[in-house]
Every structure is written in structure tokens, then in C-alpha cells.
């Protein structure tokens, strides 16, 4: 199994949804975690509502900083598009998905970002098989 870390600034929207999709689609292929460089401490209610639409309860997730996740060897570190605010994570493979932060988007636009994240996570899982 590959260890995958999804990182954004607040660990409240994009990285949380990526972790959720990793858990939904990557069982037995990837171990997933998410964190933020400046964690908000809460998961965005819009992310919770958006993930509920696809059958995942994100309300049980917590927002973590980099110092609160396991210090393990990362096979993949995926940043969500947070530019200089995302720290350098040591990993065998690094990718930046360049996603807009949906926290101020309307539900329809938020769902588009969610769906892009799901597609990217599925592609990553294929690479890890």
C-alpha cells in the first residue's frame, strides 16, 4: 500500500475531500491522510454538505496540521493548489493539482471542484496499483 498525503492551507475543504475520496475508492491500495500548513481547526460546512451528496460523512473528520499527522515515509504528497503557502513535504512523488479554493463558492461551483478532486484521486489510485 502507498502512503498518500493531501495538503492544503486550512485542511478544511480540498484536502479533506481528497482524503475522503481516497478512503472511498482506494481501500487496499492507498493509506490516506490530509493536513494543512495553517489548519483552521474545523472542516468547512460546505465540504461536509457537498460530500454528503456523494454518500460520505465528512462531519467526523478533523482539521490537522502537519505536526499532527503520522511522521511516515510518504509515497505521494499532493498539494491542492495553495502555491507558496503549502510547505515542501518530503515524498517520493510530489504533485500540485492547482485547484481553486472553493470555500467561498456557491454549492454548484463547489460541487464542480469536488468532482474534479474525485477524478484526480481515482487517477492517482490507478497509478498506485
Model regions: which residues?
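Phosphate-binding/catalytic loops
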Residues: 76, 82-129
